[in-house]
């Protein structure tokens, strides 16, 4: 059973609302957005979305709609998503603290509206630690990463030092490279000349999962 155009539109509305506000829209808000006279039509479409494995609903909660992992979503439905929606893989974890080893990935895909990021990211990483707290990046956030090996001093980057990955503020001077935390509880990282160092990408925005 495939989704109708209105069901695909409702799914996009739910996705964008959760990404923007951290919670799902209420059934009344969905009804208002689509011009329905009441919530009965919304309930029918939500029933279909739940049967198709797109969402699950938490009983007794007005904003209890939850998105399922998109690895469970029909590829045909994904192909019909708007060009304004990015389909981004979550590739693993990145340290906002001491650098951590590269992660093999979470086997997960997230749909996000393009407007949340600049430039457009190529993938997402889950933040571990709070060394970037004062930049508004917290433990558990998903950060968008634009894949590039070029960066300027003052940009927030995802960097690799030997086999470890971290997200920090890049500072380049004539004779040294430093990766600065945005939390006074953490010390800067001085990149030594004998270390294998590379910029893996630029930070370009974040998604804060509903906790």
Swiss-Prot record:
The record marks 96-97 as: Cleavage. This is LexA repressor. One of its GO terms (biological process) is proteolysis. Keywords: Autocatalytic cleavage, DNA damage, DNA repair, DNA replication, DNA-binding, Hydrolase, Repressor, SOS response, Transcription, Transcription regulation. It comes from the Bacteria. The keyword NADP does not apply. Represses a number of genes involved in the response to DNA damage (SOS response), including recA and lexA. In the presence of single-stranded DNA, RecA interacts with LexA causing an autocatalytic cleavage which disrupts the DNA-binding part of LexA, leading to derepression of the SOS regulon and eventually DNA repair. The active site is at residues 131, 168. InterPro entries: LexA, LexA-like, LexA/Signal_pep-like_sf, LexA_DNA-bd_dom, LexA_repressor, Peptidase_S24_LexA, Peptidase_S24_S26A/B/C, WH-like_DNA-bd_sf. Disulfide bonds: none annotated. Homodimer. Belongs to the peptidase S24 family. NCBIfam families: lexA (TIGR00498). Pfam families: LexA_DNA_bind, Peptidase_S24. It catalyses: Hydrolysis of Ala-|-Gly bond in repressor LexA. It comes from Xylella fastidiosa (strain M12). GO terms for molecular function: DNA binding; serine-type endopeptidase activity. Residues 27-47 bind DNA. Its EC number is 3.4.21.88. Gene3D superfamilies: Umud Fragment, subunit A, Winged helix-like DNA-binding domain superfamily/Winged helix DNA-binding domain.
């Amino acid at each position: 059973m495939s989704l109708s155009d209105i069901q695909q539109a409702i799914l996009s509305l739910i996705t964008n609302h959760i990404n923007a506000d951290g919670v799902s829209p209420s059934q009344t808000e969905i009804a208002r957005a689509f011009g329905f006279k009441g919530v009965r039509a919304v309930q029918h479409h939500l029933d279909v979305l739940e049967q198709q494995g797109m969402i699950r609903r938490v009983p007794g909660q007005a904003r209890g709609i939850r998105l399922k992992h998109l690895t469970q979503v029909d590829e045909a439905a994904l192909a019909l998503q708007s060009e304004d929606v990015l389909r981004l893989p979550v590739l693993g974890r990145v340290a906002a603290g001491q650098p951590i080893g590269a992660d093999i990935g979470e086997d997960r895909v997230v749909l996000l509206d393009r407007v949340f990021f600049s430039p457009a990211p190529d993938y997402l990483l889950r933040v571990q630690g709070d060394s970037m707290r004062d930049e508004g990046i917290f433990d558990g956030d998903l950060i968008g990463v634009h894949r590039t090996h070029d960066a300027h001093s003052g940009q927030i980057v995802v960097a690799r030092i030997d086999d470890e990955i971290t997200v920090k503020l890049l500072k380049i001077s004539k004779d040294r490279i430093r990766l600065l935390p945005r939390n006074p509880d953490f010390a800067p990282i001085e990149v030594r000349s004998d270390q294998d160092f590379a910029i893996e990408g630029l930070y370009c925005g974040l998604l804060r999962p509903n906790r």
